[in-house]
Curated annotation (Swiss-Prot):
PANTHER family: PROTEASE HTPX. It is found in: Cell inner membrane. It is a multi-pass membrane protein. This is Protease HtpX. Belongs to the peptidase M48B family. The lineage of its organism: Bacteria, Pseudomonadati, Pseudomonadota, Gammaproteobacteria, Enterobacterales. The keyword Zinc applies. It comes from the Bacteria. One of its GO terms (molecular function) is zinc ion binding. Disulfide bonds: none annotated. HAMAP family: Pept_M48_protease_HtpX. Its EC number is 3.4.24.-.
Length: 292
């Protein structure tokens, strides 16, 4: 329910800003400039709101609990490991959280490198050795140090903008042509055709655009693996990835998969996977391709 409310509020805010910009500039909403402004606001608006609220939304979606004071030896080890690795990586100490899940997983999120969150599953803490767990944590610390959350938000915003702009531009042309041919719309096109065509095109272009964002996501995973290898050693990271082969299928929400150590393996095609296959990640570490 909260996500629906945030979605509606975000879209309402975008529409208000859109109307204000058009009012101040005198640009027509149906013009190319108007479409570009609308596409940019909608394309980046949702992405940046999600980024700014990412820590809160992530904790809420998995039921994670931030460790304020360690209650046992495991929590103390986890905090000290994150503190040591964040110092090595040159970033501020992230918040650390644990969430209950049987799968071996962890994720990092946050709007800034120095205001981030690292969360690990109970399955990881129970199933991995300390060396393997250190490697997974270092992978997430590397995501933060590399600024991957902001990078992926920018990429998603750009892709969203192009999808919306191109879809609406083609829909506007189609509505004008078909509406005027039928003698409807009084020169402005048929609104039913416009919305129908734009919805279909946004769906189709959105699927194609996801190939681009997923490629970037897989690319960042290789660099996060390499970052972990630099922090704790290549063999520890390889051992952690080999351990992931025995894990349950991840249960985290789809919007969190991009920054989990373990992505979903069941996909129509590798093109739509947020993570490379584990064997490819292991091979990349062994070859040192991303360690240069």
């Amino acid at each position: 329910m909260m996500r629906i409310a945030l979605f509606l509020l975000t879209n309402l805010a975008v529409m208000l800003v859109f109307g204000l910009v058009l009012s101040l500039t005198g640009i027509q909403s149906s013009s190319v400039q108007g479409l570009m402004i609308m596409a940019g606001l909608f394309g980046f608006g949702g992405s940046f709101v999600s980024l700014l609220m990412s820590k809160w939304m992530a904790l809420r979606s998995v039921g994670g609990e931030v460790i304020e004071q360690p209650r046992n030896e495991t929590e103390n080890w986890l905090l000290e490991t994150v503190r040591r690795q964040s110092q090595q990586a040159g970033i501020a100490m992230p918040q650390v959280a644990i969430y209950h899940a049987p799968d071996i997983n962890a994720f990092a999120t946050g709007a800034r490198r120095n205001a981030s969150l690292v969360a690990v599953s109970t399955g990881l803490l129970q199933s991995m050795s300390r060396d393997e767990a250190e490697a997974v944590i270092a992978h997430e610390i590397s995501h933060v140090a590399n600024g991957d959350m902001v990078t992926m938000t920018l990429i998603q915003g750009i892709v969203n903008t192009f999808v919306i702009f191109i879809s609406r531009l083609i829909a506007q042309a189609a509505a004008g042509f078909l509406g005027n041919r039928d003698g409807e719309g009084e020169g402005n096109g048929n609104p039913m055709i416009y919305f129908g065509v734009s919805m279909v095109l946004e769906l189709v272009f959105g699927i194609l655009a996801s190939i681009i964002t997923m490629w970037f996501s897989r690319h960042r995973e290789f660099y996060a693996d390499a970052g972990s290898a630099k922090l704790v050693g290549r063999e520890k990271m390889i051992a952690a990835l080999q351990r992931l082969k025995t894990s349950y299928e991840p249960q985290e929400a789809g919007n969190m998969m991009a920054f989990c150590i373990n992505g979903k393996s069941k996909s129509f095609s590798e093109l739509f996977m947020s993570h490379p296959p584990l064997d490819k990640r292991i091979e990349a570490l062994r070859s040192g391709q991303y360690l240069k």
